[in-house]
Amino acid sequence: MEMILITGMSGSGKSVALHALEDAGYYCVDNLPPELLSSFVALKRPHNAPKLAIAMDVRSATSLPLVPEQLRELKAQGMAVQSLFLDANTDTLVRRFSETRRLHPLSRIDATDQHRALVDAIELERNLLGDMREQAHVIDTSMIRAAQLQGYVKSLLQNPSRQLTLVFESFAFKRGVPLDADYVFDVRMLPNPHYEADLRHQTGLDQPVADFLKAHSEVDDMFRHIEQFLSHWLQALVRDHRSYVTVAVGCTGGQHRSVYLVEALAAAFGKDWPTLKRHRELEAG
């Protein structure tokens, strides 16, 4: 029996992720009170529900501290448990709430008619969910569409052995560091294909760009140093019971250098480890 727990910021896409899991055959429950988690799982065991997906949000904030111990107990009983935390930057969340005209769950102050400003409600939610975020695999949805999020969540399910999965992500520093990054590597000092007229409108996925970068020894040096660093620490991450580790590689525009290195790293580590790739700026269009 396995279970995926979904938490995260309001407006970050938890419902989209839950729908993706439902499409993948999971028995899904939204907004389950944390104090009912263990009893709900016990209720489903006799009914042969092998895959459960449960979403919790900030409306259960007072009970969320109960969750880590319950998850440890479920793992001790032999259940495969994963925790996903969906996040997005504040500007994105403000825009999403403005577009949908929905009220943030923490907008109302207690039982009064007074309301918090939207930004204040979002920051309060971040503080309340901080511990849950620390214990989960974080997915930054700031720059991805609903269909892309569904596809990404489904791709996380492709590791039945529960071996540590490496997620390699390219990004542009000018658009911010991904919120879900465990390690960030800055490659802006490397030769930039952007300044080559015939390469400017291509990406790190294209062979001419790859050939240009391969011709510079410092690019290979950067690749080898990142590879050596990760290889040195992977077993320690396994001992720490990590399910996912996100390695973000950033350049100025997220089109050439970071994309090339993410492809190279995923190919190298993919020989021995489950790997996923994301090119944030390319996927954003």
From Swiss-Prot:
Query: Keywords on this record?
Result: ATP-binding, GTP-binding, Nucleotide-binding
- Gene Ontology terms for molecular function: ATP binding; GTP binding
- Name the residues that bind GTP: 57-60
Pfam families assigned:
PapZ_C, RapZ-like_N
- Give the source's domain of life in one word: Bacteria
User: Which annotated residues bind ATP?
Assistant: 8-15
**Entry's InterPro entries?**
P-loop_NTPase, RapZ-like, RapZ-like_N, RapZ_C
Q: Which NCBIfam families match?
A: PRK05416.1
Report the function annotation for this chain: Displays ATPase and GTPase activities.
HAMAP family (alphabetical): RapZ_like
Q: Which family does it belong to?
A: Belongs to the RapZ-like family.
Q: What is this protein called?
A: Nucleotide-binding protein Pnap_0906
**What organism, scientifically named, is this protein from?**
Polaromonas naphthalenivorans (strain CJ2)
**What lineage does the source organism belong to?**
Bacteria, Pseudomonadati, Pseudomonadota, Betaproteobacteria, Burkholderiales
